[in-house]
Amino acid sequence: MQAKSELALCCTCLLILFLAQPLAGQAQPAALSAAEATLKKPTDFRSRAEVRNEYQNLEGDGYRDIVTPRFEYAVKPSVAVRLELPYMTYDPGGGGERVSGQGDLLARGAWRAIQREGFALIVATDVIFDTADDDRLGFGKTIVAPHMYAAIDLPGYDSVFFPNIQHYVSVAGDRTRGDVNFTTLKPNLLTRWPNKIYTFLEPQFSIDWERDAKTGLTIELEVGKILSRNIAAWVRPGIGAINKYELPFVYEWNLEVGMRYIF
């Protein structure tokens, strides 16, 4: 399958970059680079541009392949705005029609409301606009999704715990499409490792209020590395653990690769 081949090529390129980095010079600059500063203080917003490619394996032989460019502008360390617009390919499997095109545009505003030693609280709102080229590539609705998460330092483990809650609700759009009303809960964990490597564990519980509060669970583990002063890359596999064939946002398994430039 072409999408799988392209993703395998991306993974191979990233693996080569990961392995090549330890061969660089041993001298380290006194000041943290932009990428290192972001890893050290993840709640200090910095402007960044990134692109990621996610392959989701669905029931049967169906799949989604999603390429998402994202730009985030830090107005100041406590305020940021974000835009992202995915390009998607969806194949339902079973001989169904494959479709490709633009997905829904997402815009976010985020504010770090509290910053104390070892603790921060961020509040944000996403607005997802109905811009998809095809009904199968988007929600068919305009969605508002308020969002809040904390950042709790765990210095004994060189980690940060990010308890995270977000609620998605449709406010406008195609009346023939189903309403959107679900909540996600994510007890995320960032851990820093030697050689500028990090991991980010993201279990996501999704509660769909339109389906009698049916709950799904996906678990993803991102393994990333700082490649230069401004560039980081990552690989993120994931699995669907609960209700993977009964909720639209719970896949069978997925694999994501990405690269980020931090200004």
Locations of the language-model features?
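Cleavable N-terminal export/targeting peptides
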Residues: 1-36
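Transmembrane beta-barrel domains of Gram-negative outer membranes and organellar outer membranes
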Residues: 26-263
